[in-house]
């Protein structure tokens, strides 16, 4: 068997380790004590003895008699009613006062001359209105008795008629008179072609407005021979007389021949004759 002999005295290394261990142990205890929550000290509640109402009254009376405290004065009715009126009620009061019509009160002591003048001026203003109303109703009744139709108000908005005309406005790059004649010859009889060469635009006048409408609908915004054409109805339409219109001369001459100058109106009244004695 082998016996191990431990010396009683510690070596220098062991003593150094033991001292470090003791230091760490102290630090650990101090850290735990710092982290632990500290119990808050109980606050001592000071209980006040409630005073009796009778005792308070007696103390107040004694102080008033001695002159240390002034007595409380009662408020009068005027002080109680003097409150600030809200702004909303003031506005409502103003509006009602403005809308009310002044009326004459002969037995009122507060009636003044200004109110009377305003009433008289209002009565004077009302008189022409009443006369106009009377005239209006009188004329309406008279029209009903005669059986005349009611007047149609002129203010009624009538729908605007669509624009129509024989002349169209054509614009495009390098547009010429021959080009316009060739392009629009298929849509109807061309009466006149006028050009503005500097601005590359022109005006084409057809014999009928239907030809102008068809040309606008089919050619506006399209490319013809590499030229983008903008076709619109011209603002100013020159007056063009219809060509080869059969109803222009023959029809109107027949109508004029069938009607006499006196017209077809016959007078159905009877002739009234008076005696000579009645006239004298």
Curated annotation (Swiss-Prot):
Region of interest called Disordered, as start-end residue ranges on this chain: 25-112, 141-166
Coiled-coil ranges (or none): none
Gene3D superfamilies recorded: 3.30.70.330
Compositionally skewed regions (Polar residues) per UniProt: 73-83, 97-112
Subcellular location: Nucleus; Chromosome
Superkingdom of origin organism: Eukaryota
Pfam families in UniProt: RRM_1 (PF00076)
Residue ranges of every copy of the RRM domain listed in the record: 166-236
Biased composition (Basic and acidic residues): 49-61, 87-96, 141-163
Main location: nucleus
Keywords in alphabetical order: Chromosome, Nucleus, Repressor, RNA-binding, Transcription, Transcription regulation
Basic residues bias locations: 25-36
Any one annotated GO CC term: transcription elongation factor complex
Signal peptide as annotated in the record: none
GO BP annotations, alphabetical order: negative regulation of DNA-templated transcription, elongation; negative regulation of transcription by RNA polymerase II; negative regulation of transcription elongation by RNA polymerase II; positive regulation of transcription by RNA polymerase II
GO molecular function: mRNA binding; RNA binding
UniProt record similarity statement: Belongs to the RRM NELF-E family.
Record PANTHER family: NEGATIVE ELONGATION FACTOR E
Job of this protein: Essential component of the NELF complex, a complex that negatively regulates the elongation of transcription by RNA polymerase II by RNA polymerase II. The NELF complex, which acts via an association with the DSIF complex, causes transcriptional pausing.
Subunit structure, as described in the record: Component of the NELF complex, which is at least composed of TH1/Nelf-D and Nelf-E.
Identification of the protein by name: Negative elongation factor E
């Amino acid at each position: 068997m082998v016996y191990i002999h431990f010396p009683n005295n510690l070596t220098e290394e062991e003593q150094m380790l033991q001292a470090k261990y003791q230091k760490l142990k102290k630090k650990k205890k101090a850290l735990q004590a710092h982290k632990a929550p500290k119990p808050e000290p109980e606050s001592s509640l000071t209980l006040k003895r409630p005073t009796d109402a009778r005792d308070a009254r007696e103390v107040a009376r004694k102080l008033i008699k001695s002159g240390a405290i002034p007595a409380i004065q009662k408020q009068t009715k005027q002080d109680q009613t003097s409150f600030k009126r809200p702004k909303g009620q003031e506005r409502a009061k103003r509006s009602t006062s403005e809308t009310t019509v002044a009326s004459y009160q002969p037995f009122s002591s507060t009636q003044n001359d200004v109110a009377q003048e305003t009433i008289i001026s209002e009565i004077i203003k009302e008189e022409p209105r009443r006369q106009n109303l009377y005239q209006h109703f009188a004329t309406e009744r008279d029209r009903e008795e005669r059986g005349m139709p009611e007047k149609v108000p002129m203010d009624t908005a009538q729908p605007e008629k669509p624009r129509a005309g024989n002349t169209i406005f054509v614009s495009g790059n390098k547009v010429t008179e021959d080009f316009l004649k060739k392009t629009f010859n298929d849509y109807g009889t061309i009466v006149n072609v006028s050009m503005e060469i500097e601005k590359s635009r022109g005006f084409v006048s057809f014999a009928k407005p239907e030809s102008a409408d068809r040309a606008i609908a089919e050619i506006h915004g399209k490319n013809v021979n590499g030229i983008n054409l903008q076709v619109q109805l011209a603002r100013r339409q020159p007056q063009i007389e219809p060509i080869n219109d059969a109803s222009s001369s023959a029809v109107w001459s027949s109508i004029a021949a069938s009607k006499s100058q006196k017209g077809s109106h016959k007078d159905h009244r009877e002739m009234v004759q008076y005696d000579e004695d009645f006239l004298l």
